[in-house]
Amino acid sequence: VMRLFARQIESQYREHLPLKEYARRTGVSVTHLNQLCREFHNCSALMVLHERLILEAKRCLQYTQMTISQIADYLGFSDVAYFSRFFKRHTLLSPKAYRGIMNNSDDISETNNLIKLF
Protein backbone atom coordinates (compact mmCIF):
# COMPACT_ATOMS: atom_id res chain seq x y z
CA VAL A 1 0.00 0.00 0.00
CA MET A 2 2.77 2.46 0.92
CA ARG A 3 4.69 1.81 -2.30
CA LEU A 4 1.55 2.40 -4.32
CA PHE A 5 0.84 5.58 -2.34
CA ALA A 6 4.43 6.75 -2.93
CA ARG A 7 4.09 6.11 -6.68
CA GLN A 8 0.77 7.96 -6.74
CA ILE A 9 2.31 10.94 -4.96
CA GLU A 10 5.33 10.98 -7.24
CA SER A 11 3.26 10.96 -10.40
CA GLN A 12 0.48 13.30 -9.29
CA TYR A 13 1.61 15.58 -6.45
CA ARG A 14 1.18 18.68 -8.65
CA GLU A 15 -2.51 17.90 -9.21
CA HIS A 16 -3.52 18.54 -5.57
CA LEU A 17 -5.84 15.54 -5.48
CA PRO A 18 -7.89 15.12 -2.30
CA LEU A 19 -6.54 12.59 0.16
CA LYS A 20 -9.72 10.58 -0.34
CA GLU A 21 -8.71 10.05 -3.98
CA TYR A 22 -5.24 8.76 -3.04
CA ALA A 23 -6.86 6.40 -0.52
CA ARG A 24 -9.33 5.16 -3.14
CA ARG A 25 -6.54 4.54 -5.65
CA THR A 26 -4.53 2.57 -3.10
CA GLY A 27 -7.58 0.56 -2.02
CA VAL A 28 -7.74 1.69 1.61
CA SER A 29 -9.71 4.17 3.68
CA VAL A 30 -8.34 7.62 4.47
CA THR A 31 -8.11 6.57 8.12
CA HIS A 32 -6.05 3.49 7.26
CA LEU A 33 -3.80 5.47 4.91
CA ASN A 34 -3.17 7.98 7.70
CA GLN A 35 -2.38 5.17 10.14
CA LEU A 36 0.12 3.67 7.70
CA CYS A 37 1.74 7.04 7.06
CA ARG A 38 2.06 7.70 10.79
CA GLU A 39 3.65 4.26 11.19
CA PHE A 40 6.11 4.60 8.29
CA HIS A 41 6.69 8.36 8.05
CA ASN A 42 5.72 9.54 11.53
CA CYS A 43 3.26 12.05 10.05
CA SER A 44 -0.13 12.18 8.34
CA ALA A 45 -0.72 11.29 4.71
CA LEU A 46 -1.47 14.94 3.98
CA MET A 47 1.88 15.93 5.44
CA VAL A 48 3.61 13.37 3.19
CA LEU A 49 1.94 15.07 0.20
CA HIS A 50 2.89 18.52 1.44
CA GLU A 51 6.51 17.47 2.03
CA ARG A 52 6.73 16.31 -1.59
CA LEU A 53 5.42 19.65 -2.83
CA ILE A 54 7.88 21.52 -0.60
CA LEU A 55 10.77 19.35 -1.80
CA GLU A 56 9.98 20.20 -5.42
CA ALA A 57 9.46 23.88 -4.59
CA LYS A 58 12.88 23.98 -2.91
CA ARG A 59 14.48 22.26 -5.89
CA CYS A 60 12.92 24.76 -8.30
CA LEU A 61 13.92 27.73 -6.16
CA GLN A 62 17.49 26.55 -5.78
CA TYR A 63 18.30 25.07 -9.17
CA THR A 64 16.15 26.92 -11.72
CA GLN A 65 15.65 30.49 -12.83
CA MET A 66 11.86 30.10 -12.75
CA THR A 67 10.05 33.00 -11.12
CA ILE A 68 8.11 32.31 -7.94
CA SER A 69 4.92 32.76 -9.95
CA GLN A 70 6.09 30.17 -12.50
CA ILE A 71 7.00 27.74 -9.71
CA ALA A 72 3.59 28.22 -8.11
CA ASP A 73 1.91 27.50 -11.44
CA TYR A 74 4.18 24.50 -12.14
CA LEU A 75 3.28 23.01 -8.75
CA GLY A 76 -0.44 23.42 -9.35
CA PHE A 77 -1.12 26.47 -7.18
CA SER A 78 -3.61 28.80 -8.86
CA ASP A 79 -2.56 31.71 -6.63
CA VAL A 80 1.07 32.73 -6.06
CA ALA A 81 0.15 34.32 -2.72
CA TYR A 82 -1.30 31.01 -1.51
CA PHE A 83 1.86 29.19 -2.68
CA SER A 84 4.02 31.68 -0.77
CA ARG A 85 1.95 31.21 2.41
CA PHE A 86 2.06 27.41 1.98
CA PHE A 87 5.84 27.48 1.51
CA LYS A 88 6.40 29.78 4.47
CA ARG A 89 4.14 27.72 6.74
CA HIS A 90 6.26 24.63 6.03
CA THR A 91 9.75 26.17 5.92
CA LEU A 92 9.41 29.35 8.02
CA LEU A 93 10.88 31.26 5.06
CA SER A 94 9.27 32.97 2.10
CA PRO A 95 10.19 31.49 -1.29
CA LYS A 96 12.22 34.62 -2.05
CA ALA A 97 14.13 34.39 1.25
CA TYR A 98 14.79 30.67 0.72
CA ARG A 99 16.16 31.32 -2.77
CA GLY A 100 18.37 34.13 -1.46
CA ILE A 101 19.80 31.97 1.32
CA MET A 102 20.44 29.07 -1.05
CA ASN A 103 22.11 31.32 -3.62
CA ASN A 104 24.33 32.84 -0.93
CA SER A 105 25.25 29.43 0.46
CA ASP A 106 26.30 28.35 -3.05
CA ASP A 107 28.51 31.46 -3.31
CA ILE A 108 30.07 30.73 0.08
CA SER A 109 30.73 27.10 -0.89
CA GLU A 110 32.35 28.15 -4.16
CA THR A 111 34.50 30.73 -2.36
CA ASN A 112 35.59 28.15 0.22
CA ASN A 113 36.47 25.69 -2.55
CA LEU A 114 38.58 28.33 -4.33
CA ILE A 115 40.37 29.20 -1.08
CA LYS A 116 41.27 25.51 -0.60
CA LEU A 117 42.94 25.49 -4.03
CA PHE A 118 45.44 28.21 -3.04
Give the ranges of each region predicted by the language model.
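A short, Lys/Arg-enriched amphipathic alpha-helix from helix-turn-helix/homeodomain DNA-binding modules
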Residues: 1-17, 23-28, 48-66
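Basic/polar phosphate-binding segments, predominantly the helix-turn-helix DNA-binding elements
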Residues: 16, 20-52, 72-97
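Terminal helix-turn-helix DNA-binding modules in bacterial transcription factors
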Residues: 39-78, 100-118
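Short intrinsically disordered, low-complexity coil segments enriched in acidic
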Residues: 1-7, 97-98, 103-104
